[in-house]
Design a protein with these regions (language model features):
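Ubiquitin-like/PB1-type beta-grasp interaction modules and other compact soluble beta-rich domains
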Residues: 1-71
Length: 72
């Protein structure tokens, strides 16, 4: 498998390869996380959930995703 047009990023401390045109929204869907129940930090800045489809992931980005789980 060629890594042409792929970029390395870190998600929750793990290195992964993605297409260079990937958005944050696509990444969250790929990880099978419910967009309404996550908080996402990109390079130490919290992202607006309403703009996830517009934020393109770049080489060496550091992404932290926190998934909220209900309980009591």
């Amino acid at each position: 498998m060629k890594n042409k047009n792929k970029i390395k990023i870190k998600v929750n401390g793990k290195k992964i390869l993605l297409s260079e045109s990937e958005t944050i929204e696509k990444l969250v869907k790929r990880l099978k996380l419910p967009i309404k129940k996550v908080a996402i930090e990109l390079n130490r800045k919290i992202l607006d959930k309403n703009r996830l489809d517009k934020v393109k992931i770049k080489k060496n980005d550091k992404i932290e995703i926190v998934h909220f789980i209900g309980g009591g």
